[in-house]
Swiss-Prot record:
Ligand binding (Mg(2+) 1): E94, N532
Family recorded in the similarity comment: Belongs to the FGAMS family.
Stated role: Part of the phosphoribosylformylglycinamidine synthase complex involved in the purines biosynthetic pathway. Catalyzes the ATP-dependent conversion of formylglycinamide ribonucleotide (FGAR) and glutamine to yield formylglycinamidine ribonucleotide (FGAM) and glutamate. The FGAM synthase complex is composed of three subunits. PurQ produces an ammonia molecule by converting glutamine to glutamate. PurL transfers the ammonia molecule to FGAR to form FGAM in an ATP-dependent manner.
Binding site for substrate: S95, H96, N97, H98, R117, Q241, E313, S314, Q315, S534
Residues where ATP binds: Y53, K92, D494, G531
GO cellular-component term (any): cytoplasm
Protein name: Phosphoribosylformylglycinamidine synthase subunit PurL
InterPro entries noted in UniProt: PRibForGlyAmidine_synth_PurL, PurL_linker, PurM-like_C_dom, PurM-like_C_sf, PurM-like_N, PurM-like_N_sf
Organism: Chelativorans sp. (strain BNC1)
Enzyme Commission number, as recorded: 6.3.5.3
Keyword Disulfide bond: no
Active-site residue list: H50, H96
């Protein structure tokens, strides 16, 4: 059945499209009449949070987005950063949260597909992917189903397309029970003189539809992604898109081949709001109008209405403005790859967005007001109440060895091998470090020494306690993970996941997180070049923890000198960089406090950004000089977990000195800005004393805390734990949980 265009517009219909009464009045004032049903759908799609960023734009403008290496910042399909030698890295992270909760396999799969298109739309060949996943409590009846579906969807699409998944995160928390998070990242390589943009230029030029046919899948997807969930959630399943990675692979090859011919003036992938958003963005950015004839759009279903065709989010589709003389060559390329090619419209000089269907005009709207001049809100926000700092002395001592084993086998700190073994981590043949290290590392093809490092980070429990410090910490940990490989951190993309911005306390979390992120990015010269905001992550009024995911990219000039987390040999000195004399002090909001003592209290660890920069620059220097044989940052679980991960990665044990003060704080405190390093030096070696003195001159604490060797990890006076016992604790939880739902 075809949906007519002359449906009466009622307040109920307006509300069903996610538009507030004042927004609908603004539409009436803008166009001077009642909109058609298709026009209502177009406004609904373009003015929702997912497309317009109407609640967040005011604060996103405060973020640092430029730097000497930045070629393209926010506002395009992806960010672009120069890596020298005429090459650049193109990358972005984006959410597919709501679709993945409704239909986990397709929701996650199309999230991967969408972010890959964002990258190759810019003219880059994708070389790496990551994903940051948050699920509800392991004992929630839906969690196991969601984990299985999401991981299968990511693997199914990414593996088939042919991009290696080199990193990511998985967290569990009851606050995600009704709203999981799926944040997908992709990066690609391009030539700096071969970047393509979405800004249309020139009047009367053909607008060309490319790729797969249009169906009814995903109609209303962008609007669904801008709303809270309620008890009608299952009814939203038809709004989830269906992906085909093999078609996407053909689309990639066809686009890159066409780009090489010089035919492309502007290009935009059809993501959220499909044909509507892609056409509006191309025209609005270029100060041009766009006229589309829907009778020429390739469709795979009969009797599709204009409303459905304009709002369909069928996957693997592109919109381009082409040079007219190149049309035959362009069509030949796309036909060769088995893809549709259709001239569906033209650019105009009247700044109107005109839609024709069945010989009739079904929409005629001002294009700028739909696009870059959409509504913008300065929503009220409240300063959240900050928890007091936790006195570590109030935390009773627990057995260090038992505590370490419990942490290694906990849902949040256990091995993610079950997850990443379902992803192809080695395809393309350039992966130098796969998941399990501080950052994924991929060799830059056609260059003898360069590699790129990738990391994704945020600690939601820190953000819940103090989103300002949590925002700073997410940036700092990402910067630290890149540094720990020896990479120069270049730039980041963010994925800001929050609840309902109409609630001042939620908006307060968002604002403070933005302020923290901005402060950290400025201090660390780590600009934000792309990103995504996902709001209304709530179910029945229950918001997720604030989760501002930060994904960063770093450049390793010579990958033969990169550092890994595995102990490199026996008898090597173990050093702790950037730590206080007592090694660790901060137990507030720590994994140890939560998982061993069952307490979620205190302020998160503060981030001293000047200290972070000093320590990181020193660590990067000693990695590149060859002095350091292994490096690992200290994060969740503190020093003890970092040491255990280094031992498990190598099969080599270590003996660690007894700390001077509290063993709990020393081994499990989550003080920021710390790294564990090893050097092929004896404790009594004069070179080690020189290294420690060099650190002191650089304003960095460097403490010798132990030595590698044997097959056991002994932390101070605690009982020794064999590396095999560590691995058994670490590797067991996830497979048991996914096999039979075991929580032990």
């Amino acid at each position: 059945m075809t949906i007519p265009n002359d449906i009466r517009i009622t307040p109920e219909l307006v509300a069903a499209h996610g538009l507030k009464p004042d927004e609908y009045q603004r539409i009436l004032d803008l166009i001077g009449r009642e909109p058609t049903f298709t026009e209502l759908g177009i406004f609904s799609a373009m003015w929702n949070e997912h497309c317009s960023y109407k609640s967040s734009k005011r604060w996103l403008r405060t973020l640092p987005t430029s730097g000497p290496q930045v070629i393209q910042g926010p506002g395009e399909n992806a960010g672009v950063v120069d890596i020298g030698d005429g090459q650049c890295v193109v990358f972005k992270m984006e959410s597919h949260n709501h679709p993945s909760y409704i239909e986990p396999y397709q929701g996650a799969a199309t999230g991967v597909g969408g972010i890959l298109r964002d990258v190759f739309t810019m003219g880059a060949r994708p070389i790496a992917a990551m994903n940051a996943l948050r699920f509800g409590a392991p004992d929630h009846p839906k969690t196991q189903h969601l984990v299985a579906g999401v991981v299968a969807g990511i693997g199914g699409y990414g593996n088939s397309f042919g991009v290696p998944t080199v990193g990511g995160e998985v967290n569990f928390d009851p606050r995600y029970n009704g709203n999981c998070l799926v944040n997908a990242f992709a990066a690609g390589l391009a030539r700096t003189d071969g970047i393509f943009y979405s800004k249309a230029e020139g009047v009367g030029l053909p607008v060309v539809y490319l790729g797969a046919k249009t169906g009814r899948d995903g109609v209303g997807g962008a609007t669904m992604a801008s709303a809270e969930f309620d008890e009608t959630i299952e009814e939203k399943r038809p709004t989830v898109q269906v992906g085909d990675p093999f078609t996407e692979k053909c689309l990639l090859e066809a686009c890159l081949e066409l780009m090489a011919t010089g035919a492309v003036i502007a290009i935009q992938d059809m993501g959220a709001a499909g044909l509507t958003c892609s056409a509006v963005e191309m025209g609005a950015k270029g100060d041009l109008g766009i006229e589309l004839d829907l009778d020429k759009v390739p469709v795979r279903e009969e009797r599709m209405s204009a409303y459905e065709m304009m709002l369909s989010e069928s996957q693997e589709r592109m919109l381009m403005v082409l040079r007219p003389e190149k049309e035959p060559e362009a069509e030949e390329i796309f036909r060769k790859w088995g893809l549709d090619f259709a001239i569906v419209g033209r650019t105009t000089d009247d700044l109107r967005f005109r839609i024709l269907h069945g010989g009739e005009e079904v929409a005629n709207l001002p294009i700028k007001e739909l696009g870059d001049e959409a509504p913008e809100y300065d929503r009220p926000w409240a300063e959240p109440k900050m928890p007091p700092a936790l006195d570590a002395a109030t935390v009773p001592a627990a057995d260090v060895a038992d505590s370490l084993l419990k942490l290694l086998g906990s849902p949040d700190l256990s091995s993610r091998r079950w997850v990443w073994e379902q992803y192809d981590t080695l395809i393309q043949g350039n992966s130098l470090q796969i998941p399990g290290g501080d950052a994924g590392v991929v060799r830059v093809e056609d260059h003898p020494t360069k590699a790129l490092a990738f990391s994704s980070d945020v600690t939601p429990r820190y953000c819940e306690a103090d989103s300002f410090e949590g925002g700073k910490q997410a940036v700092a940990e990402c910067w630290r993970n890149l540094t720990a490989t020896g990479a120069d951190p270049l730039a980041v993309t963010d994925n800001l996941n929050f609840g309902n911005p109409e609630r001042p306390e939620i908006m307060g979390q968002f604002v403070r997180a933005i302020k923290g992120i901005g402060e950290a990015c400025r201090a660390l010269s780590f600009p934000i070049v792309s990103g995504n905001v996902s709001l209304y992550n709530e179910t029945l009024g229950q918001a997720i923890p604030p989760t501002p995911t930060i994904a960063g990219v770093g450049l390793i000039p010579d990958w033969s000198k990169m550092a890994r987390i595995a102990f490199a040999g026996e008898g090597q000195a173990i050093l702790l960089a950037g730590a206080p004399e007592s090694w660790g002090t901060h137990l507030g909001q720590s994994a140890y406090l939560r998982d061993v003592h069952g307490r979620a209290e205190g302020a998160p660890p503060p981030v001293d950004l000047a200290h972070e920069k000093r320590v990181g620059d020193f660590v990067r220097g000693v990695i590149r000089s060859g002095t350091v044989t292994a490096a690992h940052d200290c994060s969740d679980g503190g020093l003890a977990v970092a040491l255990a991960e280094m031992a498990m990665a190598s099969g080599i044990g270590a003996r660690i000195d007894a700390p001077v003060n509290s063993a709990s704080a020393a081994f499990f405190g989550e003080d920021q800005g710390r790294y564990v390093l090893t050097a092929a030096l004896a404790r009594e070696d004069a070179q080690l004393a020189t290294l420690i003195e060099d650190a002191r001159k650089a304003g960095v604490s460097l403490i010798a805390i132990g030595v590698t060797g044997g097959r056991e990890l002994k932390l101070g006076e605690a009982r020794a734990i064999s590396v095999e016992e560590l691995k058994e604790a670490h590797e067991g939880w996830f497979p048991r949980f996914m096999q039979d739902g075991s929580l032990q």
